[in-house]
């Protein structure tokens, strides 16, 4: 793992969290229990404080950053999709930010909300609970349905389970030169399927 102290501040990572070895955590970063931080994620706490609360996940290639005297927060069980950028914002408890979305300074995403993939949430946006946000700039299009929230929670549970699976079995290795016969397929821990 790449952890860097900055001006006397050292990242804090709960022992039950999983941080991928290629992720980078700098300075004022606080990672809670059972959090998953994916490959190539960059959490730069060299200006503002970055807080990732219990059970949340920050997936591959995500960036977290913020201005001085601000907190960038991912709430409990927050779900941040691949390549998303969070800058000086607050993501509410049990909310999902879709892949490659950008959430700007001072924006607040409400609890149990979903930000669709590729959305741009403008600085200062103030969301409400359980909104579906989409577009560039993002706007609330409707409420998140019970089925959508259930789907989100199953996906988040997969990442929470992945924490333990990574602690138990992830290690650096050399590639095989050819595929073995009867190569097994990996299985998830829930019955979640892709949204279509």
From Swiss-Prot:
Pfam families: Hexapep. It comes from the Bacteria. Residues 187-196 have a biased composition (Polar residues). The keyword Nuclease does not apply. One of its GO terms (molecular function) is transferase activity. PANTHER family: DYNACTIN SUBUNIT P25, GAMMA CARBONIC ANHYDRASE-LIKE 1, MITOCHONDRIAL-RELATED. Overproduction of CaiE stimulates the activity of CaiB and CaiD. This is Carnitine operon protein CaiE. It comes from Shigella flexneri. The gene is caiE.
């Amino acid at each position: 793992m790449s952890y860097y102290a900055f001006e006397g501040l050292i990242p804090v990572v709960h022992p039950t969290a999983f941080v991928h070895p290629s992720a980078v955590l700098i300075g004022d970063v606080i990672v809670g229990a059972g959090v998953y931080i994916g490959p190539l994620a960059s959490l730069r706490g060299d200006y503002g404080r970055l807080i990732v609360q219990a059970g949340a996940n920050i997936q591959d290639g995500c960036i977290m950053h913020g201005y001085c005297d601000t907190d960038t927060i991912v709430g409990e069980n927050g779900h941040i999709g691949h390549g998303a950028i969070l800058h000086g914002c607050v993501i509410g408890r049990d909310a999902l930010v879709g892949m490659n979305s950008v959430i700007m300074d001072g924006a607040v995403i409400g609890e149990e909300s979903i930000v669709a993939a590729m959305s741009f949430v403008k600085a200062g946006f103030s969301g409400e609970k359980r909104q579906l946000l989409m577009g560039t700039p993002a706007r609330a299009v409707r409420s998140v349905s019970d089925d959508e929230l259930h789907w989100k929670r199953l996906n988040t549970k997969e990442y929470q389970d992945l924490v333990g699976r990574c602690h138990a079995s992830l290690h650096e290795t050399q590639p095989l030169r050819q595929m073995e016969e009867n190569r097994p397929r990996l299985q998830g821990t829930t019955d979640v399927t892709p949204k279509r």
